Amino acid sequence: MRLAPIKLVVNYYVLFGKSLNQEKENLIEMKGVITQCLSNGMFRVKLENGFKVIAHISGKIRRNFIRILLGDSVIVELSPYDLTRGRIIYRLKPTNSSTETLRFNTNLK
């Protein structure tokens, strides 16, 4: 009797052709720089293509207590349905010799 719910879940994925990782395939990942720190783990991020988005911290970054500060370079995950909001999934290590980082930091606003 306990196998019936598991069988229903498996049949659902077989019938509708959905997998657990299928939703992650549609996401867009872009580099950006933190321009403003908002409340509750929200940040305003300027992407390398010039767009500005509001992004929140992913769960893994919260659990590992990774600090994200103003001017940090990050990777933001965007949904194709709403390109104004995103999730910060990685903080890039700072490099002093990178001219790209300096260019981003001078144009924060």
From Swiss-Prot:
Keyword Phosphoprotein: no
Gene3D superfamilies: Nucleic acid-binding proteins
Subcellular location: Plastid, Chloroplast
Annotated GO MF terms: ribosome binding; rRNA binding; translation initiation factor activity
Domain S1-like span(s) in chain numbering: 18-93
Disulphide linkage map: none
PROSITE patterns documented for this protein: S1_IF1_TYPE
Family to which this protein belongs: Belongs to the IF-1 family.
Assembly information from the UniProt record: Component of the 30S ribosomal translation pre-initiation complex which assembles on the 30S ribosome in the order IF-2 and IF-3, IF-1 and N-formylmethionyl-tRNA(fMet); mRNA recruitment can occur at any time during PIC assembly.
Biological role: One of the essential components for the initiation of protein synthesis. Stabilizes the binding of IF-2 and IF-3 on the 30S subunit to which N-formylmethionyl-tRNA(fMet) subsequently binds. Helps modulate mRNA selection, yielding the 30S pre-initiation complex (PIC). Upon addition of the 50S ribosomal subunit IF-1, IF-2 and IF-3 are released leaving the mature 70S translation initiation complex.
The name this protein goes by in its record: Translation initiation factor IF-1, chloroplastic
Organism of origin: Tupiella akineta
Gene that specifies this protein: infA
